[in-house]
Amino acid sequence: MISQLNLKNLKFSAALAPKSVSRFCATLVVCLVATGFGTANADIIADRKAGFKGNADSMKAIAAAITSGDYQTVINRAEGIASWANTIPSYFPEGSDSGDTKARAEIWFEFDAFKAKAKANETAALTLVTAAKSGDQGAMMAGLKNLGANCKSCHSNFKD
């Protein structure tokens, strides 16, 4: 990082022409910027993978909680899924389509459709919250099935 460089001890030879210094500086800037973006790209991909893993874990926990009658867990986990769904598009900034990812390029070519899928997932999760608050186990199972269908729909279009 630039903040770690000790520029006071950096000495340039008088033999270095201004053009050479300019080229060096330009190369240094390009390398620093490229490294920073590479790191940011890897971080956002890791973060979104963690979010989707948490989502999958919540789906399993919800299924078990419905069966056991633990409706508060259903509410908490479904609210978490809704919150995650609301933020999903922000985890797919331009340039995060390469690296260790299964995201298809269609996400960025059809970003409005991708955002609509995330919104539908949020709505399905909130519908499940409402069902859990009512205590209607049948409505919860239907809500979980609908939520799963929303997840699958997005995967079909946007994930390899």
Predicted regions and their residues:
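Bacterial N-terminal signal peptides that target proteins for export
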Residues: 2-27
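Processing junctions and N-termini across compartments
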Residues: 36, 145-148
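Extracytoplasmic c-type cytochrome modules immediately beyond a signal peptide or single-pass transmembrane anchor
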Residues: 41-146
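The canonical Cys-X-X-Cys-His
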Residues: 147-158
